[in-house]
Amino acid sequence: MKNFETMAEQYKTLPCVGQLNDGLLRELKNLCRFTDFPGIRLLTERHRNECLSLIWPKNLWLRLAQPVDVAGYSEQQLAELNDHYQGFKENLCLIGAIQIGRKDVPIFVGKSSRIFCHDLEDDVLYYIAEDFDKFVRFGILGTNVITCSEPVYTRFYYDGPKFEKLETLKDLGLLQEPLNLNSSLRFNRKTALALKALRRNYISMLSELDELARCKTLAEIEHFVSINTGLKLRLETPIFTALILQDRKNIHCGTSDQKRFEEQEALFEKVVVLGFLNISAEDYGLRPILCIGETGAIYYYDWIDKVLTRIADCLLTFARIGFARYCGDFGYDKIGKVTARFGRLSTLGSAPVQQYSWYLSK
């Protein structure tokens, strides 16, 4: 019996260190909810090196910090992360950093109130929580940054969000001085530069598609295509290099081909022809056409197979397919439409987000 008592005593853990500070926590939640970036910067400056305990991973701490405090990053590097989340331009504001092993992982809030973290080793920006309140309640789930790492410490059990000074946590051995990973980074910097170039090209492509994506109805799309006939929109997809806008009446095909196209259309929904898809600059043959339906779905019609195929749930997904293969999270298919219908918001995601896009893909 004594042996069991000894073992129980050996593995007994203590309540989480730190003090409750409901006022500070409430202020931080409100600033993040209303995306008050100047207010967040002032608060993190005022409470620099205050650490907030998180429930998951076990016994993790969020250190409130300024850009200069995050080990392994320059201020310019942090500023360049605004377009890292699968090509979206999401303005970010640094809240602080968590420590995984000896590595600093910066935590951001975006203009959509979503919470992100960045892993320097794979140069990927991860979406980790719908808002700061859920971040505090549930911690960080479902990212490679966390699941591949050991908990920072296990001597205390979590009993609610508490604040503690960084120096106190260091004295207790709960946090350590972070390593500057720039000196011993395993990530291939040549690959990082290539990814940055791909992101720039991707953003440029979305800019070209942006006006088309803002159309709210098929009638608006039809009008846009008719007044921009012949306009070439560059694509960064694995196969196609450009979309050349062309309306249905100017598609050069025989009567039988046109009838076959209409038969295929009847199997799905009413569609508007967007134009031809170019495979290369020297492609002068019968090129496939791209269409968009009333639901916003994208369709591909091949004149050889004479089959209309649904290839994406919206224009944005079609545009992302080529980019997603270069991303660590491969999450483009989980994003779905930017809003309930295509258009309404910019494909760049720069307008205020009224409705979270990942709900719409479920």
UniProtKB/Swiss-Prot annotation:
InterPro entries: US22-like (IPR003360). It comes from the Viruses. Belongs to the herpesviridae US22 family. This is Protein U8. The gene is U8. Pfam families: US22.
